């Protein structure tokens, strides 16, 4: 191998490593500290794919959001802060000035207490930058008691926080 070829190879290595953003996972727990679900986070073109799976939650629609602090102190989970909103937008998919990067579609839980959902967070990343879920304060996924109306700022009238999980690198 020539010195020139070796130099090109060494320059390309950081580019390949930088292109591979990490993935993430959150274990969701209720106010009693019992595990009620998981969420996975994978990089995708233009954002982050979120897959949520829950059990033992009340039936019905529940607002789910990414919150701006990686803390889930029960019973109210207020330690998770407000919604993840690096672009300083208003709340909700139906708000002309929205949505927060942390806004996700409602989660519909069946009569059996279970639900699965997949969504893409546009403008978020698992790499570095303002939209990173792994920024200085980290982030958490929060499940709310009520449905999100997808327009009322700051949280869509989605009620109390009933489950929370810190998003960690996988």
Locations of regions flagged by a protein language model:
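N-terminal secretory signal peptides that target proteins for export/translocation
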Residues: 1-2
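Bacterial N-terminal signal peptides
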Residues: 5-14
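N-terminal leader/targeting pre-sequences
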Residues: 18-170
């Amino acid at each position: 191998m020539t010195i020139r070829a070796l130099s090109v190879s060494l320059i390309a290595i950081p580019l390949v490593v930088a292109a591979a953003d990490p993935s993430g996972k959150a274990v969701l727990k209720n106010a009693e500290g019992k595990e009620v679900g998981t969420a996975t986070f994978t990089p995708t073109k233009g954002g982050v794919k979120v897959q949520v799976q829950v059990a033992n939650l009340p039936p019905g629609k529940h607002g789910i959001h990414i919150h701006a602090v990686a803390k889930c102190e029960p019973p109210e989970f207020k330690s998770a802060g407000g919604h993840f909103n690096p672009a300083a937008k208003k709340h909700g998919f139906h708000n002309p000035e929205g949505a927060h990067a942390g806004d996700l579609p409602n989660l519909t839980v069946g009569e059996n207490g279970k639900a699965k959902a997949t969504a893409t967070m546009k403008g978020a990343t698992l790499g570095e930058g303002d939209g990173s879920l792994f920024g200085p304060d980290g982030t958490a996924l929060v499940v709310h008691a009520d449905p999100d109306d997808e327009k009322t700022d700051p949280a869509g009238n989605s009620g109390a926080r009933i489950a929370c999980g810190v998003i960690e690198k996988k």
